[in-house]
Amino acid sequence: MTDVIIIGGGASGMLAALTAAESGRSVLLLERQSRVGRKLLATGNGRCNLTNYHAAPDRYHGEDGTFCAHALQEFDVGATLQYFASLGLLTVSEDSGRVYPMSNMAGSVLDVLRYALERPGIEVRTGQVVTAVKPAAEGFAVKTETDAFAARRVILAAGGGAGSKVGGVMDGYRLAKALGHHRTVLYPSLVQLKTDPTYPRALKGIKAECGITVRRGSDVVAENRGEVLFTEYGVSGPAIFDISRAVSTGGEGLICQLNFFPDWERREVLDWLRLRRQTMGAHEASTLLTGSCHTRLGQMLCKAAGFTNQRAADLTDGDLERIARQATQFELPITGTCGFDQAQVTAGGLRTDEFDPQTLESRLVPGLYACGEVLDVDGDCGGFNLQWAWSSGHLAGQLL
């Protein structure tokens, strides 16, 4: 009988396997894909943003905002980087706190983990779709589509539904439910937003630094600031990812409001437009924002205000006010998100009040543990979700 079976060979599952083996336990890691760590290769645009120096409970979300605290403290960013250094991974950090492999290749992170999994005491079996986990006399009986195994303990590290094209599945929730556990409602998070495509489609590929406000009527649902990328279907970029959770859970009737002059007061924008009217008077109104933003974006904002072919000199102060409003409160009706297929993480998961935050052991089924995305913990964009994977995998792997 194996000491522990780990279901899921993603980031948290691999860390759990390595941690359990370090204490001398025999480990069987079951992964449904043809290789472990497939989702890692897609993180950080292929660079793998493996952690963030600002990782702390206030960067995470879920019904219990403090549930992640012990795991993050027990295996913090410093311990994580020291651990990966021991595996041979060199890293670099950015001013934002994001940490990447020095190679700028996600494959480097996966490779050092895969080599580490070759240590004695760990058996990795890929292509194993787990169909059932049942308590048995001395532990658990675990069945897959092709085999049956027995273990004294089980760690559920099956991930969430996000990124289904690179391995996201709902298996973990199904297996936990059969054992009496419950989950919250699931939403896609860290995902692109779909909006009325009229203007974004014309601006496809353009990036802009913006203040971002999501509203329902006069109510503010979410706020952020950062880089926004216009796409054929709406908007994307790190700043959009961080508000996407609020959009996913916020229901209908939402509007994304963009401020292309986030450091200016409206009156300052208006004063500047008056000056531009003087200097660009002989030119078309659509040139007024030239020099302040991408040419196509400036033209679009003037068009949205209702001005295209008019001479700049012919614009009234009221006309300039309309342009200033578009430049500081440009509105895009939100029609949804790009869903779980494109999402980087699942918001929601197994209810954390059914697990001990000091050990990640189930309060309902002794000997069952859970870690990573399958739990109701999701972080902001920027390496926070991988830090949760490492921290929770390390804690669960101790089998306390």
Give the positions of each predicted feature.
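A glycine-rich dinucleotide-binding beta-alpha-beta segment and adjacent secondary-structure elements
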Residues: 126, 298-378
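Glycine-rich FAD pyrophosphate-binding loop
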Residues: 5, 21-45
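Glycine-rich active-site loop/strand segments that organize a redox cofactor
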Residues: 47-93
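A conserved short coil-to-beta-strand element within the FAD-binding core of flavoproteins
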Residues: 126-139
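An anion/pyrophosphate-binding glycine-rich loop and adjacent beta-alpha core
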Residues: 34-36, 41-42, 50-57, 90, ...
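Glycine-rich loop(s) and the adjacent beta-strand/alpha-helix scaffold that form part
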Residues: 153-199
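Short hydrophobic core segments
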Residues: 5-7, 30, 130, 149-165, ...
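Beta1/beta-strand and adjacent pyrophosphate-binding region of the FAD-binding site
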Residues: 1-12
